[in-house]
Amino acid sequence: MSIFNTKRMQLLGMTISAVLLLNNPLSADTSEAKKPFSEYLQECPWIGLIANQITYGPITISDVNIHDGDKLAFASPGETLNGMLKYKVDSKDLDSLHLYHLVIGIKKEGAQDCITHNLGMWNSKGHGHFSLKAPEKPGIYEVRFLFTEGLTCARAREAWNSGNEKPSAAATIGIIIVE
């Protein structure tokens, strides 16, 4: 049996490509895991489905890699995780001459990195790199993104961290398991 199967699902009329985890998490290294991945999957079965491509508002995120793996990473408390992703911004619904930022962070922990900027006048695409600090408390955490307006990256991160704007579950692009 393979370590993962790709399935196509119909959800509210939209086709999404998802990865179903079976015995191992995608291409993440589980040799250092403190318990079998199947136990994590039993505790939180939702971590078995992570979309390969996510469109959230005017931005599409794809090809997410966290910590030299795929969309799932095991980490020690406080460990720095590096990742990369591809993005595509459709500017047709953005305000012209407004500055927008793609921010990456961890649910309930806050925004941690800013990947790219867009002026709102042109479509853009590319790939970006990011760093995340794993939470200090062991657990299962969602990596999310927010595409928001702000004069600087610091202000865009503050929009998330202050609670004024928070990415929904639809903006989940990865999972970090802190052991």
How should each PLM-predicted stretch be described?
Residues S2-L12:
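Bacterial N-terminal signal peptides that target proteins for export
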Residues G13-N23:
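Bacterial N-terminal signal peptides
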Residues D29-P77, I177-E179:
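Short, compositionally biased P/S/T/A/G/V-rich stretches that sit at domain boundaries
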Residues P77-G83:
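Structural beta-strand segments of beta-rich domains
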Residues G83-S91:
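Aromatic/hydrophobic beta-strand junction motif of beta-rich domains
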Residues N118-G126, P135:
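Short proline/glycine- and polar residue-rich coil/turn motifs
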Residues S131-G139:
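Short, surface-exposed loop/turn segments at beta-strand-coil junctions that are enriched for proline
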Residues L151-E179:
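Short beta-strand elements
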